[in-house]
Amino acid sequence: MLRVRKRDGRLEEFSRAKIVRTCLRAGASKKIAEKVAEELKRGYTMG
């Protein structure tokens, strides 16, 4: 399970859907939002 540390210090499971949703809210196209989420997921490693 891939986890990320939130700004307040909590650990939370990585959510690709949350990344996409946030990008869309910021004005990115669906294509760009999907690409950002995929690149972030690839950039993180377990552990």
From Swiss-Prot:
PROSITE patterns registered for this protein in UniProt: ATP_CONE
An example Gene Ontology molecular-function term: ATP binding
Annotated keywords: ATP-binding, Nucleotide-binding
ATP-cone domain ranges (all copies): 2-47
Protein name per its UniProtKB record: Uncharacterized protein AF_1547
Species, as recorded: Archaeoglobus fulgidus (strain ATCC 49558 / DSM 4304 / JCM 9628 / NBRC 100126 / VC-16)
